[in-house]
Amino acid sequence: MNTLFMHCRPGFEGEVCSEIAEHAARLNVSGYAKAKTGSACAEFVCTEEDGAQRLMHGQRFAELIFPRQWARGVFIDLPETDRISVILAHLREFPVCGSLWLEMVDTNDGKELSNFCKKFEVHLRKALLNAGKLVDDPSKPRLLLTFKSGREVFMGLAESNNSAMWPMGIPRLKFPRDAPSRSTLKLEEAWHHFIPRDQWDERLHGDMTGVDLGAAPGGWTWQLVNRGMLVTAIDNGPMAESLMDTGLVQHLMADGFTFVPKQPVDWMVCDIVEKPARNAALLETWIGEGHCREAVVNLKLPMKQRYAEVKRLLERIEEGFKARGIRVEIGCKQLYHDREEVTCHLRRLVDVKKTKAR
């Protein structure tokens, strides 16, 4: 079980390889990364049998940028018939698992396996339960079977609290009919990824205020309004009338890069198509100057050296806050709804000073 298998957006296999190889080196896990361009997956093959497990245990999945999902395990070949018997035979070396996910890569060929996986899962789940290899226990590892075809599958394990919250890392979000653009799903997915669900009522509620830079027609504004926030939408373009009719949106025709709120707000969101360094500087200014407490900003990526550029920008942001003496929680992820971009989330942390006993 020395291979770490990872899902990703097609075309970003090289970024996954660069990122995971860097973490493996940090954790002294020897091996090599490999991937085929356009395959929507990558592998890190460890030279030691426990290498993949050490890599997963030493790295929080939520802090990875480009991998959508990961699992440690092995590839096995399957016959045309009686695939379940072959899988059960290989599972003798696996522990009892607490859940089962069948996955496929995010390519056209992978999507064609969707119906097969749905039907096969019913029979496989029954066989695993009867064999005592599957129980309903989230504390036990998750069994992840990624089908490359009907004849080849990656059998892997991942901890449910240190892997993707959805199969293949693809969220099942429904597009709101009254949202003005599909970009609204980017912000909703960002909240799912960066904010624990049990903290939404505390950090995303109706008594809050927000600013949406580059708002038109209002996809991201819609999410803020849907949580009951008062929103200032900054854009020289028109906003959707349905949003303006809510009475919760003030539309200002201004430049998103020069606008400064008169009073600090709770949230700033920005999906402006601009050079990533400029959007990163916007993040640093808004959080650093105290204009907002939390922010979600998209960074558009260059054509080459994408992981290196993201890493450089994140390091620059972090160094900027250190120089200001400000504690900030920083997250970055290429979300499923992102294309040639990554989404950054920043949250300014407040130091709680201990009061001296008199």
Describe every region a protein language model picked out:
Residues 1-358:
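SAM-dependent transferase fold signal centered on methyltransferase-like domains
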